[in-house]
């Protein structure tokens, strides 16, 4: 199946604690059905002091979020949209359903 969400896409979060926020996909994990979005689903890890990190402390990082909880941001309106595929100039391209605009990538 073709990838509807790819690295570099602008997405809107549909549900959860970050609902309504926008971000960019930094990593797609298609085998797991998850994506990592910049600034979304931030988790905190408590790190013990070690030789590599003598101070220890709190590490904040982005955790994967289910791909079903994000939607592509429409390039024209900035709202969530579904994606369909079409062949234009002999190439398969992704198209935003709401506006008909081509999605880069």
From Swiss-Prot:
Gene3D superfamilies: 2.30.30.30. Keywords: Ribonucleoprotein, Ribosomal protein, RNA-binding, rRNA-binding. One of its GO terms (molecular function) is rRNA binding. It comes from the Bacteria. GO terms for biological process: translation. InterPro entries: KOW, Rib_uL2_dom2, Ribosomal_uL24, Ribosomal_uL24_CS, Ribosomal_uL24_KOW, Translation_prot_SH3-like_sf. Signal peptide: none annotated. It holds the Pfam family KOW. SUPFAM superfamilies: Translation proteins SH3-like domain (SSF50104). Coiled coil: none annotated. The keyword Nucleotidyltransferase does not apply. Belongs to the universal ribosomal protein uL24 family. One of two assembly initiator proteins, it binds directly to the 5'-end of the 23S rRNA, where it nucleates assembly of the 50S subunit. Part of the 50S ribosomal subunit. This is Large ribosomal subunit protein uL24. It comes from Zymomonas mobilis subsp. mobilis (strain ATCC 31821 / ZM4 / CP4). The lineage of its organism: Bacteria, Pseudomonadati, Pseudomonadota, Alphaproteobacteria, Sphingomonadales. The gene is rplX.
């Amino acid at each position: 199946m073709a990838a509807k969400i790819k690295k570099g896409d602008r997405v809107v979060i549909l549900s959860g604690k970050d609902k309504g926020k926008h971000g960019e996909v930094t990593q797609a994990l298609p085998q797991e059905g998850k994506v990592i979005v910049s600034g979304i689903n931030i988790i905190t890890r408590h790190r013990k002091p070690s030789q590599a990190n003598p101070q220890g402390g709190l590490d904040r990082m982005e955790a994967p979020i289910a791909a079903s909880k994000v939607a592509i941001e429409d390039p024209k309106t900035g709202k969530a949209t579904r994606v369909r595929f079409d062949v234009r100039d002999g190439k398969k391209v992704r198209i935003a359903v709401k506006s008909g605009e081509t999605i880069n990538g």
